[in-house]
Amino acid sequence: MGSSYQESPPLLLEDLKVTIKESTLIFPSEETSERKSMFLSNVDQILNFDVQTVHFFRPNKEFPPEMVSEKLRKALVKLMDAYEFLAGRLRVDPSSGRLDVDCNGAGAGFVTAASDYTLEELGDLVYPNPAFAQLVTSQLQSLPKDDQPLFVFQITSFKCGGFAMGISTNHTTFDGLSFKTFLENLASLLHEKPLSTPPCNDRTLLKARDPPSVAFPHHELVKFQDCETTTVFEATSEHLDFKIFKLSSEQIKKLKERASETSNGNVRVTGFNVVTALVWRCKALSVAAEEGEETNLERESTILYAVDIRGRLNPELPPSYTGNAVLTAYAKEKCKALLEEPFGRIVEMVGEGSKRITDEYARSAIDWGELYKGFPHGEVLVSSWWKLGFAEVEYPWGKPKYSCPVVYHRKDIVLLFPDIDGDSKGVYVLAALPSKEMSKFQHWFEDTLC
C-alpha cells in the first residue's frame, strides 16, 4: 500500500517577509569588441519561458551570507566569460523569424535579499509553497520588459545564518543536465579551481538538416495551428489540489520486480520507467470526460517525458553541450489497456518511448520542428528532477539541504523530486489535479501498489 507524503497540506508560510537589499546587473569580466548572436536550435525555440530553482543551505559559521554573496557575485562574473550568452538578450531575427540570443553584453541580474524567518521556520521544503517564488527574481524592475536578463541570481539570507540561492533562467539557455554542469562549474570557481567542464555553446550541432527530412510519425508533437487546447507548459487558473506521494526505494524495487515478471524483456525495467508507468496509469484512469462520468476506457491517453539525446546522436554531442539536448518521448494507449494490462506491459510501453529515440529519429524530430513549428503535446508530462543531482553539488559551504523548482499550477505536469533525506533511490511524486481527479488518482496509485 502506498502512503502519501502529505495527506493534507502542511501549514505554510504565505509570506516569507523577504526584503530586496540590492538589485544590480553583472557582466562578464572579459570585455569583447565582437558583437555576435547565438543560434538557437528548434528544441530551444519552443522553450521560451523561465525556469526557477531554489537551493537551500544550512548555516555555516565559516561562511556568513554576506561573505557568500560577495563570493558568488565574483564567481558568476568570471563564469560568464565561458557562458557569455547569459549576459545577452533574446531577440527575433527579422530575416528568419527565429529566436536567437543577441550576445550584446547587456548583463545578467544579481539580487541580494533577506528574510525575517529562519530556515527551519520555512517548514516543509518539499511541499510546493507558492511563497518560495519570493526567493527568486525573474524580472528586474529597473529594466523595461524588452530588456530583461536571461539569467537572474538571487541570494536570500535567513535570520539563522542559512540562505537560499534562487536562480531564474530562460529555458532556452539550459536543460537540466547543462544547468547541473553550470552549477558544478560555479562550485569549481568558488573552490578557486578551473572549470570542471568547460561548456560547449555551439547550438548549431542540433541544427535542422537542409533540406529537412521527416522520416517518422511524430505523435508527440502538434502543429501550433492544429492545437486548440493549452500546452503542457502553460499554467492554469483552475483550482487544483496538490498532493505529494512518496515512493521509498523498497517500493520502487518491488515495482521493478513486478514489472520484470510480466514484461517480455525488450526494454530495461528502470526505476524511472516503473514510476512513470505508475503515474500514467493513475492519471489516465482519473480523467473523466464530463463531471460525474466514469473514465471513458476507449479514450487514448498519451504520456510524455524528456530524453537526453547527447549520447544517442551520431556523432555524439559533447557532454558539455549547454543547450536543450532533450527530446520528448511518448507512450500512447487506450485507457482500457492501462486498466487491464499487466503492469509490466505498461512499463514496456513507457520504455519503448525512450528506445524509439535513435539518431535518425532525433534528427527527424528536429527537422519536423523546422517544417511545422510545433511543440510537444499530450495528456500528461512527467518532469523528472529526480536524478539531476542539483543537491549533490559541493560548494565551499557544503551541499544544499534541498534543491527544487518553484512550482506553479500545471495540472498536466507531474513532477518527480529526489528524497530530501538523501535517499537518492526514493522519489516524491507531485501531482496537481482538480479535487475529484485527485481522489481517483490516489485510489489508482494505491491500487497499483497493492
From Swiss-Prot:
- BP-aspect Gene Ontology terms: double fertilization forming a zygote and endosperm; regulation of DNA-templated transcription
Q: What is its EC number?
A: 2.3.1.-
Q: Which InterPro entries match?
A: CAT-like_dom_sf, Plant_Fungal_Acyltransferase
Q: Where in the cell is it found?
A: Cytoplasm; Nucleus
Q: What happens when the gene is disrupted?
A: Female gametophytic mutant which exhibits embryo development without any endosperm due to a successful sperm cell fusion with the egg cell but an impaired fusion of the second sperm cell with the central cell, thus resulting in single fertilization. Embryos can develop up to the globular stage in the absence of endosperm.
The UniProt entry's sequence similarity note says: Belongs to the plant acyltransferase family.
Role = Required for double fertilization of the egg cell and the central cell by two sperm cells, resulting in the formation of the embryo and the endosperm. Involved in the regulation of embryonic expression of PHE1. Essential in maternal tissues to ensure the paternal embryonic expression of several genes, including RPS5a and FAC1, both of which being essential for early embryo and endosperm development in fertilized seeds.
What's this protein's name? Acyltransferase GLAUCE
Organism whose genome encodes this protein: Arabidopsis thaliana
Classification of source organism: Eukaryota, Viridiplantae, Streptophyta, Embryophyta, Tracheophyta
Encoding gene (name): GLC
